Amino acid sequence: MQKYEIILYWSDEDRVFVAEVPELPGCMAHGATQEATLKSVNEAIRLWIHTAEEFGDPVPEPKGRRLMLA
């Protein structure tokens, strides 16, 4: 798995954890727990990359995995 930065935070409005991947526009996931959200966002990263490659779009190189809790 590529090592992309993940920003994980709690959304009071939606009452779920949200994970965003800034290096992959639009790549995000949510879940009831931090663990479930991280599992979902890793799948979202895999699917984002697969879709980009399928359409011939560039896939950004990861800057290094870092988990930020906000």
Task: Map each language-model feature to its residues.
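A short, exposed loop/beta-hairpin motif centered on an aromatic-Gly-Thr core
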Residues: 25-36
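Hydrophobic residues in alpha-helical membrane-spanning segments
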Residues: 23-26, 61-63
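Short, charged, surface-exposed hinge/linker loops at domain edges
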Residues: 1-5, 35, 39-70
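Short aromatic-glycine-(Arg/Gly/Cys) micro-motifs in beta-strand/loop hairpins
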Residues: 9-24
